[in-house]
UniProtKB/Swiss-Prot annotation:
Belongs to the vasopressin/oxytocin family. It comes from the Eukaryota. It holds the Pfam family Hormone_5. It comes from Conus bayani. InterPro entries: Neurhyp_horm, Neurhyp_horm_dom_sf. One of its GO terms (cellular component) is secretory granule. The lineage of its organism: Eukaryota, Metazoa, Spiralia, Lophotrochozoa, Mollusca. Residues 37-44, 131-144 form a propeptide. GO terms for molecular function: neurohypophyseal hormone activity; toxin activity. Its main location: secreted. This is Conopressin-conophysin. Keywords: Amidation, Disulfide bond, Secreted, Signal, Toxin.
Length: 144
């Protein structure tokens, strides 16, 4: 074999390996696939609403929040552990808020009347969640 034929063979081998690498990385991994094994073309996971608890929605495995506040570790809040059994992630309703929580700073405002911002493992009172309408009444709260 000539020297140029060897170089062409190596170049072809390198190109084939690069193509194979690209095809393998396009595979369906656990974190970016829907239940039927198809890759989500937008790169987003399918979402469903989080389960409801006695007076609001499940925010984490042991956190139930609604307009009257949040319960953590109570019997009712422990029903939220069922969320962990479902492989499809759920979406907590509420506008975004920021927590000073290492590794998980993107929370949701879940108790508008009180102004509580939660992530899956903790909640804090946040002025960011006490949004008011133009009339000065907190959004989602009833006048008493």
């Amino acid at each position: 074999m000539t020297r140029s034929a060897l170089q062409m063979g190596r170049l072809t081998l390198v190109l084939c390996l690069l193509l194979q690498l690209v095809l393998v990385t396009q595979a369906c991994f656990l974190g970016n696939c829907l239940n039927d094994g198809e890759r989500d073309v937008d790169g987003r996971e399918a979402m469903r609403p989080c389960k409801y608890c006695s007076f609001g929605q499940c925010v984490g495995p042991q956190i139930c929040c609604g307009d009257r506040g949040c319960e953590m570790g109570s019997e009712e809040a422990n029903k939220c552990r069922e969320e962990d059994e479902d492989s499809t992630p759920c979406q907590v309703f509420g506008w975004p808020c920021t927590l000073n929580n290492p590794g998980n700073t993107n929370g949701k405002c879940v108790a508008n009347c009180i102004g509580i911002c939660c992530v899956t493992d903790t909640c804090v009172v946040s002025s960011e969640c006490q949004k008011e309408s133009k009339s000065g009444i907190r959004v989602g709260c009833q006048r008493s």
